[in-house]
Structures are given as C-alpha cells and as structure tokens.
C-alpha cells in the first residue's frame, strides 16, 4: 500500500499554502457574507463566518469558515456551537479542497458519445440546457405519462433532499429513488407507523446516564450528536453499551460490548425486551397509559376498523383485531378501544361506573368523526396546564449555559382506572358470541419470551449472561428519583440494512418506550422543532400555491404492489423495482431521470442499476463533480458547495440547535444553488410556485426571507384542553400565524443576528414544544402536522390539535401495529416486532460451503462520507484504497497478509479490496468498505466495478415492508488477488489502458487535485 505520508502537521502546512494561494486572487463580483458585512477588511485580514458544516452530509456541526480577500482558506470548529462542542473533523477541514477542486463542475454540459462510453462532454449554455430538459421531459410525459419520469436524490447539498418532492409534483410522477430508503428512512418509516415521525433520534446531547450506541460509530461522523459530542457523552455516562459486530473506536472503552453476529440485531433487541419484562424494569404507568399494551386482542373475530389519515393527509382504512365498542355493540364507535380495568369494582363502589362493567375504553377518534371525546379515556378528567406541572429537568452533565428543559410530572389516570396488562377475559360480541380476549402486552410478552437470552445467545453469538447483564444495566434506573429512564437508544444505520429493517426499528422503539425513555431527558425525542424550516420552507413541496399530483398518480407508484406499506408511506418508490422497470418496461416504461446527488451505488445491486442508467432515454444530473453515475447522464448541471450558499438550519435530530448555513464565498463560474435551478425549471414549465400574483416564481432572496418569517417573539398559536368527566372543551391561545411579527424581517437580518449570537437553543425558542418533555402528555407531540412539523403561515397549516397522545391510529405508541396489521392481513406475526434470519447468511443451507464468511459493510471512515471525497488529496492520501477487515487467524487460513489485494466474491459479483488484519472482527466475519470508486479512472463509470461492494448483493433480497436492500450479513468467499487471477496481471485494479488506480499515499497524481483558484469567474 505504501507509506501514509500525510500528518497533522502536513495538513496544517497545506492549509497555509492554500491560504496564500487564495489571497493572490481578487474577490468575486457577487455578494457573500464575508464581502458584504466585512467589506472594510483589507490586505491579508481574515473574516470568520459562522455557518453549518455539511462535510459529512448529515451532522449540523457549527463551524467557522475563514475567508481572506473573498477566498475561503480553512474551516475551524465553532466552540460556541453547543451541539458539536467545536468539533471540526477531517471531512470538514477538507471542504476547502472540495470547494476549490480543479475537477469541480463549472458549466452545464451535454454528452456527445453513446452511453456506456466516455461521455465526451461539451459545454452548453444554461438556456440550452434548461430548454432541452423541458423539451425532453414534456415529450416523454406526452408519450408515456408523468410516471415515466423518475426523480432521484441523495444526501447533503443542503436543500436537494427535497428535490424529488418538487419534481414529483411538477411532473406528476409518483416515482422517486431516495437514499432515504436505506439511510434513516426505515427508522422514520417504522416510528411514524408506531409512535411519531423520526422518534429514532435520541437526545444524546443531554448526556444520558446510560449511553447505548447501537450499530454505528457516531464518534467519526453522522447524526446530530457525533464526533466530539459522542466521545464526551460516552465518557460522562455511568454506563456505556456498544452493540456492534466489530470493535468500533469507542467500543473498546465501553462497559459492555455486545459483539453480535451481523444481522441479528432484532433477536438481541427482543432478548433485551424479555429481560426488561421478566425483571419488571418497565415503566408501568407509561405502558398502561401511553401505549396500546392494555388494548384487548380478539382473535375470534374478523378485523374491523375505521378510516384514518395517511402521512400525506389522504385516508386509508384501519382493519384490526383490537377490540372496539363497535365489535360488542351495534352502532358502537370503531374508535373506542376496550381495556379491562383491574380497579372497576373499587371505582364502582366509589360511584364511578363504566358503561361496560369491568371494561372501559379509550377513544382514538382523533379527527372528531363521531364525537369530540377522541384522545381521552371514558370519564377522564384532564387539564393541559395540569399536564405541564412539573420541574426543571436535572441532567447532571450539561454544558455550561445549556438549557435543561421542562419536565412535567407523570400524570396518573383520573379516574384511577388500572388497565390490565396480563390475564384473559371473556366478553360477548354484538353477534352474541362469547369470546376470550387478552391484552396486547400478553402477546408482546410471549413474543419476547421466544428470544430469552439463552435463545438469543445461539442466534447472536453473545453469551446469555452478557445479554442479560447489558439489558439489566440499560433497564435499571441509576437514579429513580428522576422519574424517567437512563436514556434512549441511539440505534443507527446498521439496523436498517437487513430484510428485517422495519421490524428491527419497531423493536427499538418499543424498548425505549417501555423503559420510560420516550421524550424524556436523554431519551428519544425525534426531530428538533423550531419555527424556521431547515429545508427551506418555500423551496419544498409544501410551498405556498404548490399543486400536488392527484391521488390516482400516487397509486401508480412503482413497487407498491410488492410492498403495500409503501402506499401508506408514500415518500419513496422502491428503487429495485424502478431500475427493473427501466430495463423491462414492467409495469410501465420509465424513460427519464432527474437526479440531485443521488448515487446508484448506495442500494440495490450496482450492476443492475448501472444497466438501467445506461438504458434511459434522457437523464439530468445536478452535482459538484463528474461521478460514476452522471457518466450515464445526457445533461449535467453544476451546483454550489455548502460554503457557497444560504439556508436556514435546525438540527434534523434531537440536538435542539437552530442556526444557518451561510454563504461564505461565491460559487465558481456558472454553478448555481439547487433551488434556483428547480425554480427556473418550474418557470419554464409554467408550474406556479406560489399563488401570489406577479411572484409566481420567486427568487432566492424571497425564499430565504420567507423561511424565517415565523421566528417571532410572539407566542405561536397553541391549544389547551380541559376535560371533565369525559366532556372536553378547548381554548386557542397565542398569535395566529398570519398575524405574527417576524423577529427578523429579512434573511440578512437573521444571518447578522446568528453571527453575533451563534447557535440558538430550540428549548428557548419553543418552550412549550421542544423545551418541554413528555409532550405526549401535554399535547405538544401533536402540536404540528403529523410528519414534518412544518408550519405554513399563509393558511394556518401545520398546526395540530394539541391533544395528548401520539399520531398513530390508536393515538398510543403502538406495540401492536395497526398499520402493519391492516396492510399485511396474511402475516399476523408482523403485528408485533419479529426477528428474521438474514437471507444468504450462515444459516442458508449448503451455501455456506462455497461462501463460508459473513460479510458486513458500511462502517464510518474518518476521511470519507459514503462515496464522497475520493478526489480530495488530503483524504485520499490518508486512505488511498478500500480496506477489508479480516481477523488475522482467518487471513492466515487463506494465505492473506496485511496489505494484500483480495478478491471477495458471491454468485452476484466480485470485487477487490486491500486486506487489513484486525482482531476486532470475528473469525468468520469480514468487514468491507462501501461505495468506492476511483475519480482518477477516466473510463465510463470511473472504476466503480473494481471495488463497489453492492455488486455482491442479491438485487431482490429486501425488507418486505420498506423495500430496503439487504446490504449486510451475506455469505462470501475470499482469496488473494495474484497476477495470474487479475486483469493486466496486476492485483491492483487498472483502467482500460492498464494504468493502476491511485493506491499509495505518495502517488504524484494526488497533487493534480490540489486547490485551484483560476477559472471560477
């Protein structure tokens, strides 16, 4: 491999050289903050611009970009950013090399050569490019319908993650390929189904007493609370539990390392559940009052139900075996779910009598279809203000100046019912038949008992005693006086990459809930809620005046027949099915694609996806670079880097930070900000963005001003409820959104305040919402719309009903999923979390004889983010080649030594990576690196076929609910790459001319990628 020559000193020295080169060139004619606000600086004076890093595409690290004479010369951590503690990782520092890279796209280009060959790019004008796009899209739409045009999106680039929503509406297509399908999406999908959108996000920033780091190395990158924050959280925790097949960086410091076999997370989660239940470590009040655990299951009747709302606002029908008033009484409400009350006789003696004797009910009529008691128990007494009574939270290890948040006391039942969790009861149905019913908890308890530690030990490879010890440590409250659990579970990307993605996430959601860690300090809280829109409100599919496709268009979504729940979810089509449709025309032709930073290497079998890309009639790609995927494009459009654009920014997870991405320097040449490109397309297609006469296609300044309008000193509208003996009344408070006085009239004012103040704490901005815990009790969990929490000042949209509970069909955290039950009636086992053995894994019959090793992948690399940064010299010098981690004992069996190139093979493909001997993986497991390509290779595709790991996967091995690819835990074989078994007689991958890829740290080609400042005007 050669010697790694880049040291920290070299890193800093190179930065100094970069700065000197930057100073030699004058400022751009366009306005950036450093030029506008600090125009008085002269000579070599520098300006530090506070902004938000996007070097890893997910984390909102606060950083400062140092600008000298209009040129960014380095990135530093912002010590005032409480959410990231001044962190500035290698990817962030390398952003300067990305922004000033000689291979940046500067102009629109069109291809001149056939697909599959070197594209022969030719520069064209923006007008020609955009008109060509409109003409081709309209032609394809006229021939095949809007559904023949698909949209694709990846991560980062600030705003592009919602581009597919815009184009879907504009083109009337239901088809969008998203990285979301395999990254965060299954977690968001599952939690939306059973609790609340993205409740997978954990408030690690308040430093829980027990820190559970499950399936990720967030100390390297990714997620709200990563890098320096993660290290600090783990170090301060009383107990740190790491769950990972490999010894991760922080794993060696953990108190418990749950060293599981890849793909067995679901079994381990259910084993933890079994321990929690058997040791009675669950929060009994929460389980009885805020989950559907006490709801009664009747297996002797046909499932029935009611219409309820999808995530997009349309309706679907719940069909459930949970017992309802309509099942026992003609004309009864299908929304009233029955429970058995252990206290019914005592209450009766006190003069409180239930309508159905020992049975009482909870009314989930959240839309008020039948009556207004929806959201409340029979005869309940409830008051919103009493629900807020409590105290300031008391987390021990907050940073100085960090807000604690308000912690309402747990609210007991009033009247003092006691819903039964266990037992079997008889009840007569409306047809006269007497049946036996059991609480959901009994079924859940039985499911968990199938995975006792002794059973899970056989599946996961972790000793039963270690499973029990870790689960007990998590569930046993270190300080019971707090009234809440030890902290949530930071379950990360790895748990999504299996055919059990959704069920895995449900198991974690339940675990967090039953242990009293839902929306509590250090618990799982979901996405940060603030009045600004971190995705640019005006540049989203929810823009004022934006039209949406008719329902019949959504019903055409590709993959919906194979994955019925996608019709409920509606936020992506199945990527596997879409690529198949491009190739086969089944179920209908898909002939065009619009892509913003999407990456065909991230999911599905790469070879199959490449075939589809080469088969498209027309493909447009927006990007910073020439990439493997856009080598198949017909037109490529250059976009701005994160230091070259403006965007409001709030933590996407639970870190609770609000700030901005600030334009520090001008983009090069003709590169544009994604929203401006899409707005131009809308104008050319005569698709009105707003309903404001004369401003149908607003410019970026209007959009930025619009994005911060609801940030105000006024108290935004909220609702309080008063319920007496089951009869509710409500009262509106605060200022209607259309009447609020914006705190900042313009984006520039907001940015100026941000430069002076730094990052704001969402707890201070929205004290009734993000500043308050247990929002399911106060009503604030339902304060915003059911998915994104967006507010639309134009029509009062986005405001919820402020009723206590969750946004689920039962208004409870659903241990028994009515969504799953309704969409998969033929799979009753899926109503509760399940464990499924990975396909093509070590239990896959005789296959293990030919493919004896289990492959996992996806680990975080300090200098890369998925496929990004392979052309940045600092990063590539430190990590020039993909590495496969192999246990030294295993390597010895195969005659493999450190640094050898190794073939890794399945029946679907084979790749080469470099052996990295590491005792941190088990002897029967190898750990592969993912999404590798080689920018130095000029052949079409830039050498993706050499090392791209997803060539090895079964294209049709998918999660049956979300369609997520099975990206890990499959069997492979390995053997040493030799001159005899390698093309060009070279174990090192070579391009079509026989030239090897960059594979050593001293390759002179790295210097060709050093920053350049010419040709940007």
UniProtKB/Swiss-Prot annotation:
[4Fe-4S] cluster binds at residues 53, 56, 61, 89. The keyword 4Fe-4S applies. Keywords: 4Fe-4S, Iron, Iron-sulfur, Metal-binding, Molybdenum, Oxidoreductase, Signal. One of its GO terms (molecular function) is oxidoreductase activity. CDD domains: MopB_CT_Acetylene-hydratase (cd02781). Its cofactor is [4Fe-4S] cluster; Mo-bis(molybdopterin guanine dinucleotide). Residues 1-34 form the signal peptide. GO terms for biological process: L-dopa metabolic process. Predicted to be exported by the Tat system. The position of the signal peptide cleavage has not been experimentally proven. PROSITE patterns: 4FE4S_MOW_BIS_MGD, TAT. The active site is at 91 (electron donor/acceptor). Induction: Up-regulated in response to dopamine. Although all E.lenta strains examined are dopamine-inducible, less than 50% dehydroxylate dopamine. Intriguingly, this is due to the presence of a single-nucleotide polymorphism (SNP) that results in an Arg-506 to Ser substitution that inactivates the enzyme. Belongs to the prokaryotic molybdopterin-containing oxidoreductase family. Involved in drug metabolism, as part of an interspecies gut bacterial pathway for Levodopa (L-dopa) metabolism, acting on dopamine produced by Enterecoccus L-dopa decarboxylase. Removes the para hydroxyl group of dopamine to produce m-tyramine (3-tyramine). It is possible that dopamine dehydroxylation influences the multiple side effects of L-dopa administration linked to dopamine production in the treatment of Parkinson's disease. This is Dopamine dehydroxylase. It comes from Eggerthella lenta. The lineage of its organism: Bacteria, Bacillati, Actinomycetota, Coriobacteriia, Eggerthellales. The gene is dadH.
